[in-house]
């Protein structure tokens, strides 16, 4: 819809000056190129009212101010505008060079009807100079614009205006193009079923509104507006998403999101798998903050192991001293018994001495027998408790080793540190991240499947050819390489009485990040468990205490024992020493039983030096340090010799000028102490 209005040049005029006439033209061209123009119809534009702009009442009008104030617009402006007659259908087609060209023309002329100024009045106005000034010819357009985003009505309206500057004596010509807007709407959402709705509207192309002026001698012609069809068309197509397209769209979005999320999930799983694999393959020297200082876990483990070894050595020393006391008591009781037997066999001994010895020795001998039996029982109990202590120390050492196995943790805290560390600089050192990077590189280097399979096949063959079943148990134990933050771990100085030079050298070798072929052996699903450590100790003990006459086997056993991790090696050596003591106690007990059975009744007690030598030979307990070496006179305690205790044989008693008056055996209440023997002579 379009309306026109011209400014009134006559001030305080009471009549109309201009008239608006619409003329429909038809231009036809025949086959010979002859052109004929025909004026089909002519209509005067009538004064506009609300009926001509009924679209103002619709909510789809863009100009909200005009929509809510249409009454004010009609009252103030529509009375001065002229519109086409109601219910008039405008027909346009073709172009200037087409066979049929139909268009409309709105002419603005000086009117000459009864309600207009007369010819004389117009000439007078011209003489007065009213027509020398220019004036405006305004248009009021309610343009139709397709909008497919509106759910119900797809046509929207835009209120706009266009004006031209006109002057009497010049004719202004303007082309108003109407462009066809084709609308096609597919409303079906089911695949294979089409429900197509089509419509079309004409919209005024405001970008093509251009005016041109032509001088004319006929002052009655002021302006002309040619309404014609535009050569261009605009097609609008809308369709709803069908179910198959919706599924495809959702699937595409899901696949895109899955690709992005899958990348992060893949990296997350890869990192988690690498950390899990690193925890299974390696042990980590994890730093811990204690009392404001950074302490590494391997250093703490060594300190705890050495503290445990001190208690083991104390127990070993205690059992050695107890064993020495038992042997001394046994030998002393035997010596007194043989003195009693010899005294009764000699007829030259004074009857008083014999009676005195008989009365004194009988209760003393019985008392010694009871004490000897009690001490033998105590010795058996010591052997039992020795085995129990060995098991307790083994369990303690295994628990210390298992608890010291630090692992890399993988979770939200680890990821947050990784992300924050990549964006920030000069932050605190992330030791766990450094350990993970080093272990990841080691995994990539060591996990070549071809190399692993070849080495496994080769080593399995060699292992079954060289070793027996027990040796394979020790050989199968694998120590994990230590992943360190620094290239070398700062080693503190430990107690020199516990650490020897070979321990330090072996520990340095272990801390180096070297991967030998043996690190690829064995089953790693359950690498270190308490049960496996117990089996390892049993095999270690069997090889350490084996008395193989074959020198090759002996050297092989020693080499295998040296391959064990230093902390485990020195812990097991202390337990092996306890086992040696236990075996020695059982051997001495068995030997005493055989000696008592095979010893003749006329056995004479030898000199004190012979008795001492026999004691040392029967109970030859080697004092062994943690590294398997003997300690010279570390635990050896000089025993009081028999001459110092005034114990003499029969010949000595007979040749003595002094007579034996009394023999007293004073026993300390504790069974672990020596028996003090005091011989009182006159």
UniProtKB/Swiss-Prot annotation:
Superkingdom of source: Eukaryota
Name assigned to this protein: Uncharacterized 80 kDa protein
Annotated TM spans: 246-266
Keywords, comma-separated and alphabetical: Glycoprotein, Membrane, Transmembrane, Transmembrane helix
Assigned GO CC terms: membrane; nucleus
Signal peptide: none
Membrane topology: Single-pass membrane protein
Subcellular location: Membrane
BP-aspect Gene Ontology terms: reciprocal meiotic recombination
Residue positions with a glycan: 12, 34, 49, 87, 132, 218, 269, 328, 381, 468, 550, 649
């Amino acid at each position: 819809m379009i309306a026109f209005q011209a400014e009134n040049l006559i001030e305080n005029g009471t009549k109309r000056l201009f008239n608006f006439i619409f003329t429909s033209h038809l231009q036809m061209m025949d086959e010979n190129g002859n052109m004929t123009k025909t004026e089909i119809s002519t209509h005067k534009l009538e004064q506009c009212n609300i009926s001509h702009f009924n679209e103002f009442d619709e909510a789809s009008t863009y100009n909200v101010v005009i929509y809510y104030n249409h009454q004010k617009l009609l009252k103030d402006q529509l009375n001065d505008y002229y519109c086409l007659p109601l219910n008039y259908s405008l027909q346009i087609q073709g172009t200037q060079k087409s066979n049929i060209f139909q268009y409309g023309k709105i002419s603005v002329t000086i009117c000459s009807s009864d309600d207009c100024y007369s010819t004389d009045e117009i000439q007078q106005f011209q003489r007065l100079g009213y027509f020398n000034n220019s004036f405006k010819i305004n248009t009021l357009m309610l343009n139709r614009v397709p909008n497919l985003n509106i759910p119900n009505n797809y046509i929207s309206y835009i209120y706009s205006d266009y004006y031209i500057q006109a002057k009497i004596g010049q004719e202004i010509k303007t082309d108003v193009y109407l462009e066809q807007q084709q609308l096609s709407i597919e409303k079906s959402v089911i695949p294979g079923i089409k429900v197509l709705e089509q419509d079309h509207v004409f919209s005024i192309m405001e970008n093509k509104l251009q005016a041109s002026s032509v001088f004319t001698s006929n002052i009655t012609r002021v302006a002309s507006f040619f309404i014609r069809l535009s050569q261009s068309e605009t097609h609008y197509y809308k369709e709803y998403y069908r179910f198959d397209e919706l599924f495809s769209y959702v699937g595409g979005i899901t696949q895109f999101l899955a690709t992005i999320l899958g990348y992060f999930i893949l990296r997350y799983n890869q990192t988690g798998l690498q950390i899990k694999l690193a925890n299974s393959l390696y042990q980590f020297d994890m730093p811990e903050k204690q009392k404001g200082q950074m302490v590494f876990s391997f250093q703490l483990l060594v300190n705890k192991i050495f503290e445990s070894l001190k208690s083991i050595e104390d127990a070993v020393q205690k059992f050695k001293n107890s064993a020495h006391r038992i042997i001394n008591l046994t030998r002393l009781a035997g010596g007194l018994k043989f003195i009693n037997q010899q005294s009764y066999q000699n007829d030259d001994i004074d009857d008083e001495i014999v009676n005195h010895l008989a009365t004194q020795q009988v209760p003393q001998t019985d008392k010694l027998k009871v004490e000897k039996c009690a001490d033998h029982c105590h010795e058996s109990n010591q052997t039992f408790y020795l085995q129990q202590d060995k098991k307790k120390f083994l369990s303690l050492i295994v628990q210390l080793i298992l608890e010291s196995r630090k692992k890399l943790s993988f979770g939200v805290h680890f990821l947050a540190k990784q992300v924050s560390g990549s964006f920030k600089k000069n932050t605190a050192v992330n030791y766990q991240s450094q350990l993970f990077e080093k272990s990841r590189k080691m995994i990539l280097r060591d996990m070549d499947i071809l190399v692993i399979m070849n080495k496994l096949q080769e080593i399995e063959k060699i292992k079954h050819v060289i070793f027996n079943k027990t040796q394979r148990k020790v050989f199968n134990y694998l120590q994990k390489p230590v992943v360190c933050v620094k290239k070398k771990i700062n080693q503190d100085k430990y107690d020199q009485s516990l650490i020897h030079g070979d321990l330090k050298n072996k520990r340095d070798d272990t801390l180096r990040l070297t991967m030998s072929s043996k690190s690829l052996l064995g089953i790693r699903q359950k690498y270190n468990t308490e049960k496996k450590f117990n089996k390892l100790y049993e095999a270690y003990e069997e090889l350490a205490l084996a008395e193989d006459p074959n020198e090759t086997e002996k050297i092989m056993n020693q080499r295998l024992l040296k391959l064990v991790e230093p902390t485990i090696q020195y812990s097991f050596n202390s337990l092996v020493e306890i086992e040696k003591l236990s075996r020695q106690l059982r051997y001495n007990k068995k030997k005493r039983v055989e000696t008592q059975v095979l010893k003749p009744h006329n056995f004479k007690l030898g000199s004190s030096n012979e008795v001492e030598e026999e004691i040392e030979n029967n109970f030859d307990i080697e004092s062994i340090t943690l590294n398997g070496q003997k300690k010279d006179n570390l635990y050896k305690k000089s025993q009081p010799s028999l001459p110092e205790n005034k114990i003499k044989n029969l010949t000595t008693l007979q040749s003595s000028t002094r007579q034996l008056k009394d023999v007293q055996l004073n026993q300390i209440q504790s069974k672990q102490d020596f028996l003090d023997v005091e011989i009182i002579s006159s």
